[in-house]
Amino acid sequence: MYMIVCFDLEGPISPQDNAYELMKLIPNGGEIFSKISKYDDILALKKKDYEAGYTLALILPFLISHKINEDDIKRVSEKAKINEGVKELVSILKKKHKFYIISTSYEQHAYSIGKRIGVPKEDIYCTKFPINDYLHYDIDLQEAEKEILNLKDHNIEEFFNNFYEKIDKDIKKIIENTKVIGGKYKTEAIYKILERENENIKSVVAVGDSITDFKMLKAVKEKGGISIVFNGNEYAIPYAEFAFAGTNLLPLAYFIESKNKKEFIKKWNGEGYFHHVNKDIEKIILIHKKYRNIMRGKAGELG
């Protein structure tokens, strides 16, 4: 059976959170990123139409302020590890099927990783990010950065609401126009791919791991496709049909190619854990949390 395999990037393919690593080029940037990520989580919980993962747009003022450019993104991306077994998985699946990446990642990072594992640009759906076009803006955020470092959790929402409301109107427009490919936009990408391939959603295998993937996983599962969570968190696992926790992606290629998924799970005795996500979800979450921490460390805590 011909399948359209759609993988998230950060987590399943590479453990690096590229935006987090990029912010670490800025003094105290990792801490600032973590505060903004918490703000993003708050908005995702409180705002009905808000899409989680918007952190990638919200950090823009800080990247612009410190003149971070496309070469910086590429340089950070070059240091990103590729998860064990990914190249073999892509090679195996591309022999009979179509392989796509759907990622919140900035395009510079997504294309760099794609090149390293044999996925061309045209098969990657990601966040367009022409940051060099914004480097002529001069904004001083030193005082704001000091305040952010001292923020208590209960003050995060109020501070950032005011910060983004009062920010320079041109910068605000850039933030608003940055379309981060997470949430519903990942689902949109699935349908664009189906139109391009002239296939229906039952041919889709979607693989994700976090809050930005759950809508894609849910849509594919409900429409008869195959949805898989890899080293996922509590936001993604309940919406997938199957789950795999491990340190090597190669078994996932064999699972995807298997004709009887439930039988494969019963017989599996290799490294890692396969589950059919229909019961014991809390147990599955604990197993995945362990492997997520092994594989992603700090990045795995960021939504």
Segments (PLM) and residue ranges:
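Short, small/polar residue-rich loop motifs at catalytic or cofactor-binding pockets
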Residues: 1-2, 224
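C-terminal cap/substrate-recognition subdomain and adjoining C-terminal extension
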Residues: 84-88, 95, 105-303
